[in-house]
Amino acid sequence: MKLITAIIQPFKLEDVKTALASAGVHGLTVSEANGYGRQHGHTEVYRGAEYTVDLIPKIRVEVVADDADAAVLVDTIVTAANSGTIGDGKVWVSPLDSVTRVRTGETGSAAI
């Protein structure tokens, strides 16, 4: 099994959720994140004063998938999250040793 983690632009969340649902994903975790990549933040002007915003708001999406499905789901996320601008995000895949559904005790693929 794999844990797919994506950091995306907040305005792309609905597109990513819709695309993953169409790909057969029945569950995911979404959380707010702040960070920066190559863009290293930006500068804003408020009431005449200039401020450096070095942590940019992002959304973290996590999906657990079978090994065979991981590549397709990564492509699905990348396609849905792409706006063609700097800061679109990153997707990474990590090995997952086990998954257990708390309610039933099911493990492995049955718990996804």
What role is predicted for each listed range?
Residues 1-112:
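Positively charged, small/polar-rich N-terminal and surface patches that mediate targeting and assembly
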